[in-house]
């Protein structure tokens, strides 16, 4: 949660015995960064972490992108006042279409925000034609969830490095390179050997998924030879 600390108005004398109100200084705007998949992106505070979770449970404000910790299971409570947004290529568990709207000409589906007994609230926005879903959650309030989801944008002149997870290709390097090219990005292939993975397996991506690039920029893929 981002906290804004207010400054109490002060009264001072102008020398004639008249009290003058000193206005509060305006709070500094929160510095933001954009993350996304393809042309769908969302603004998050720069101070947020990336994949700052334990077993997929955020322990501080964070954006979740291909979170490796989500594969583990442990019964951990979410700390209070922690906000997050997760990017996915499929509807999140529990997603339903409560409302629809148009975002920069793209159909969007909204799962209304709801809160559980443990005080964690969540809601989501899906862009089916772009295969991108944003799931925001908060142990602060439902209002924070709605605020997070209001920062989704469609950026025709920017391309977010897509997720490496796909049920269709199983982290196949060739299939992922094709996805990048379809989005207008170039690829550079680096290879390494492995006694664990089969040839063609995608093992690393640089820059990482979620990073916004300009069309024509290069993404380096490391695959097993």
What are these regions (language model features)?
Residues 2-30:
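C-terminal region of N-terminal signal peptides and the immediate post-cleavage residues
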Residues 41, 52, 71, 112, ...:
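Disulfide-stabilized extracellular ectodomain repeats and their linkers
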Residues 86-158:
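Signature of long, low-cysteine stretches enriched in small and polar/charged residues
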Residues 142, 150-225:
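Ligand-recognition elements built from short beta-strands and adjacent flexible loops
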